[in-house]
Amino acid sequence: MKDLSNETIVHIKKDGVEYIQFKRLLEYPEIQHCYTLRNDNLDFKIDGDIQVLETSYEKICDALKIDKKKIVKPIQTHTDNVEVVTSASEQFKEVDGLITNKENITLSTSSADCTSLLLYDPIKKVIGSIHSGWKGTLQRIGQKAVKKMIDEFGCNPEDIICCICPHIRKCHFEVEDACFGSCFRLRTGHCRQVFKS
């Protein structure tokens, strides 16, 4: 894969794994983050082989020097549900966003075409990992995650850094007319700027 580094991201190839990191978040050594890239050495498909999935997590954990046992992986179902993580042993179902102020906990969300948001408040030391598919986006999961950071931890929205991970582009995203009509046309004029029929 070619080098994807640019003015906002760094493309890392290390120990047989590839991932990107946001330069803005790299300014804060107290946190770690990454967005893994699809390649022959990593496979994070939720419906794939469990052993391959576990091996992929081990590889990325080794590369980042994080404890695999401290990863919190929700069962995502394209909701607008955001939960606060207080322990790495917690399990979450029907949750697409996680936030925490606890140290040594890794938040993990999965996405293929969907958008992932990485949030960080360097003042309150709160992190967030949000899976924002089109359903969650229409339900404003990003906004709800920020609100939960405010309500639970007293974050100031002006302090929150939001990095938007790679995702499907408008030119490749097709939905059936019935879905477009019932979901997108009912929204504000903003949707007409972003989507076309």
Feature locations, PLM:
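Active-site microenvironment for binding and transforming phosphate-containing groups
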Residues: 1-197
